Amino acid sequence: MTLDEALHYIHAVCWKGSIPGLERISALLDKMGHPERTLKFVHVTGTNGKGSTCAMVASVLRQAGYRTGLYTSPYIVRFNERMQINGEQISDDELCAITEEIKPLADSIFEQPTEFEMVTAIAFAWFARRRCDIVVCEVGMGGEFDATNVIGAPEAAVLCNIGLDHTEVLGDTLEKIAATKSGIIKSGCDAVLYRSTDGVEAVVEQRCREVGAALHKVDFTQLHLRQHSLEGQVFDFGGRENLHLPLLGKHQLHNAAVALTTLDVLQKRGWNITEDDIRQGLSRVTWPGRFQIIRRAPLFLIDGGHNPQCIQALAQNIADYLPNRPLTVLTGVLGDKDYHCMYRSVADHAVEFITVTPDNPRALTAQELAKYLVSFGKPVTPCDTVADGVRLAIDHAGKDGTVLCYGSLYLLGDVINAVD
């Protein structure tokens, strides 16, 4: 099986979308001999920040000498990004071999698995074969009925910032969404919670009581920023001082506090993580596509934020890191997102918009988005391709200007390739 054949097979079931339920993934893993049962996990859910939190925890565990798996979604440039061990993506050969082995098993069960279930099974098989000491695993959507929740009790169940997203599936209130996400908390694990509303916290507390899990609420009162620049941030948290984080934005400090609380939990559970491991691991973390600088002249930043909380964080980052800088905004968006919110918060900082079409069937075309954006009274230029949009944005910004690309994670891979 070639890489194209493997990816075609995996993506061929994507028309099913994301179907909650553990029956299909359980049946498939049973035929595979349950590789997930040989692994230990840190299981991470939330509306925003879960990928960044996963990256921080995994970076520290790797620094501590553990063979650390990392499972996240979506990818930015290459599919293989979704599963990594100690920072190395799965190879094409390994991806093809495991997919070829799993294909007849998946085809033989009562209902074909969804794309996300297939990818999850492939990742678990790879992590088990490579004998990972621990896997940091990001939930796909929700928690209780997400394919990743087929695992047993994790070392830590981490609930990052909870907001209103995927409401048609997860529920239309924060409490309903929290109830679904708290389904990853199981008997015998420790739960870590990003502080939230009283209603959300009550839901999580109830779940912990029901299953007998210890709950650790992140104490953001101990979080203090010392300094920040486009090179990173220096902060204190929980008795640790002068920690360096290369990821930008106040929201990333909150994610770091969640990661540090999780690492404290792991230390108490017997994982050998030193203070130097924590400092070095945090200082070396990478997480692409989140207010990330990909070019310096002009300054070119990309951000994958696409829901109201992410856009609020982006607007704050613009104020903190790019004050009084006129922005050439390169953008594309999916039609089912709240793109009105996306642009209201950023339009005042823009001198012009350049629109492109993300590589996704749900995307607004560049022309459709341009028609909407003219209402902000700024020049708008639709482009036929992402590469054309990148060239135009760089040209219009000039070497001393600033380009901000945001609107959809599905846009960023093509932008990175075009800039390179």
Please place each PLM-identified region on the residue numbering:
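Short, high-confidence coil segments that cap the C-terminus of an alpha-helix
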Residues: 131-133, 324, 398-400
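N-terminal leader/targeting and accessory segments in enzymes
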Residues: 1-48, 52-67, 76-77, 190-193, ...
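ATP-dependent carboxylate-amine ligase catalytic core
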Residues: 22, 26-37, 63-152, 170, ...
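C-terminal helical cap/extension that packs against the catalytic core
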Residues: 197-207, 211-216, 231, 299-302, ...
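Acidic, Mg2+-coordinating active-site environments of NTP-dependent enzymes
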Residues: 111, 118, 131-138, 154-242, ...
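Nucleotide phosphate-binding/pyrophosphate-handling subdomain across enzymes
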Residues: 38, 134-137, 145-158, 162-163, ...
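Active-site-proximal loop/hinge segments that shape catalytic or ion-binding/gating pockets
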Residues: 408
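Beta-strand->loop->alpha-helix junctions that form or flank phosphate-binding loops
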Residues: 194-195, 207-229, 246-250, 278-284, ...
